[in-house]
Curated annotation (Swiss-Prot):
This is Putative uncharacterized protein SCP2D1-AS1. Residues 122-151 are annotated as: Disordered. The gene is SCP2D1-AS1. It comes from the Eukaryota.
């Protein structure tokens, strides 16, 4: 986990004004996969979703995009209640975001994750496609079972 710190006086930050903890995905951790099978299936879901939720003109994501897709940023309920949309954070262009609602389950068990995606550049929120060119990805985790998070 990492922290977001207070900005220096006079700086115009659009980030939280106090230090808050941000959860990282329990399975997608660089070099430390707690569950290889779950991690693989999760990456399969992310790869299958990429073309449908990004506004990129390239139908096949680059290696950098694929790496970015595996980095899930999760905002706390406190941030959402403060009116801070998760797309405010740097580096979220063309990324799918899984948002965990802390009060509904344990992050360490990977429960109650929901999908969201940026609304900018004409990209509309949509459910995970179950048919099409990427339907050969068989998602064994809970990735495509829940409805997208509506902000």
């Amino acid at each position: 986990m990492f922290q977001v710190f207070k900005p220096h006086a006079g700086e115009d930050y659009k980030y939280p004004r106090e230090t808050e903890t941000i959860w990282s995905h329990p399975y997608v951790v660089e070099g430390s996969h707690k569950s290889p099978l779950e991690s693989l299936s999760l990456h399969g879901c992310l790869a299958a979703m990429a073309p449908s939720i990004t506004s990129s003109e390239d139908s096949s994501p680059s290696q950098r995009d694929k790496k970015d897709l595996s980095l899930d940023l999760l905002l706390t309920r406190k941030k959402r209640s403060q009116g801070l949309h998760w797309s405010h954070w740097q580096g979220l262009n063309h990324m799918s975001i899984r948002i965990h609602t802390p009060e509904q389950g344990s992050p360490s068990l990977g429960q109650n994750w929901s999908w969201g995606n940026r609304k900018e550049k004409g990209v509309a929120q949509r459910q995970v496609p179950t048919t099409g060119t990427h339907s050969f990805f068989h998602c064994t985790s809970e990735g495509n079972k829940e409805k997208p998070h509506h902000f």
